[in-house]
A protein has these predicted regions:
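Acidic, glycine/proline-rich low-complexity segments that act as flexible tails and inter-domain linkers
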Residues: 1-41, 53-54, 65, 69, ...
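N-terminal alpha-helical segment
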Residues: 25, 42-45, 60, 77
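Residues at the start of alpha-helices and the adjacent loop-to-helix junctions
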Residues: 41-42, 59, 72, 88, ...
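Short, structured motif recognition centered on aromatic/hydrophobic residues
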Residues: 43-51, 80-81
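Short alpha-helix boundary/capping elements
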Residues: 50-56, 88-89
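Mid-chain, well-packed structural core segment of small domains
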Residues: 58-81
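C-terminal structural segments of small proteins and small subunits
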Residues: 78-101
Length: 110
């Protein structure tokens, strides 16, 4: 059996649980992310904070890139991670810092 190399957890989930992915695609993005009560920038910052707080580092690179695309600066993300350290713990913040550094270093090198 050949090994499939997925570039993201979402891609792997799409292959294994297509109905879950369809639900996310039909609900999360059209209904939640498009609600005008919060800007995409604010939603991205909230999402990054939630992922860090919950320890879901596997989704963090994609959402860090999305946050940058939605106008959150690297300095703002660094400040948010530092702020979170005092509320959700230093290990999670340190892991998030390392992931952010790798994510943005990779982006700058491409």
């Amino acid at each position: 059996m050949s090994r499939i190399n997925f570039s993201s957890p979402r891609e792997a989930a799409r292959a294994f649980t297509p109905k879950l992915s369809q639900f996310v695609d039909s609900t999360l993005y059209p209904l939640i992310w498009s609600d005008p009560a919060l800007s995409p920038r604010d939603r991205s910052l909230i999402t990054v904070a939630a992922l860090i707080a919950a320890g879901h580092s596997e989704e963090l690179p994609a959402h860090l890139r999305r946050a940058a695309g939605n106008g959150v600066t690297q300095d703002e993300l660094a400040a948010a991670i530092t702020h979170l350290a005092f509320y959700v713990g230093f290990p999670g913040a340190i892991t998030a810092s390392a992931i952010a550094n790798a994510t943005f270093s990779e982006t700058e090198n491409n």
